[in-house]
Design a protein with these regions (language model features):
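Amphipathic alpha-helical assembly/interaction segments
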Residues: 1-119
Length: 119
């Protein structure tokens, strides 16, 4: 698989994940605390995909590195918000566990890409 093929597939994966999270957030309880968490979760999950897309379009190595660093931060934040929902006891569904697993996998992938720049 070429880098271009990987990037296209991963852009689709992060976009699909963001759409899944948007739908998940719409189904969370309408409690004041969950509105805040839901908002932050939607922001970080959509930013992960958007910043990976920007990484793919980077014009220089420095620009790509800056974008992949932001992508790692946003992916890590997404894992955080999902884990917080679990730990708060607001949800313990298989849907949440699947989202935690997918967000963790996405984080590992973008962290690995970032580490290739650090070498």
């Amino acid at each position: 698989m070429t880098n271009e093929e990987f990037n296209e597939g991963f852009r689709k994966r992060t976009r699909t994940f963001a759409a899944t999270i948007i739908n998940y957030c719409d189904d969370l309880p309408s409690l004041p605390s969950m509105k805040i968490v839901s908002y932050q979760l939607c922001k970080s999950s959509t930013s992960t995909g958007a910043n990976f897309r920007a990484f793919c379009r980077g014009r220089s190595k420095n620009e790509k590195y800056a974008k992949i660093c932001i992508t790692v931060e946003e992916a890590d934040e997404t894992v955080y918000w999902l884990e917080l929902i679990l730990e708060s006891g607001k949800d313990d569904s298989s849907r949440l566990h699947t989202s935690i697993q997918e967000s963790t996998e996405i984080l590992k992938i973008v962290a690995k890409i970032k580490s290739s720049f650090d070498s």
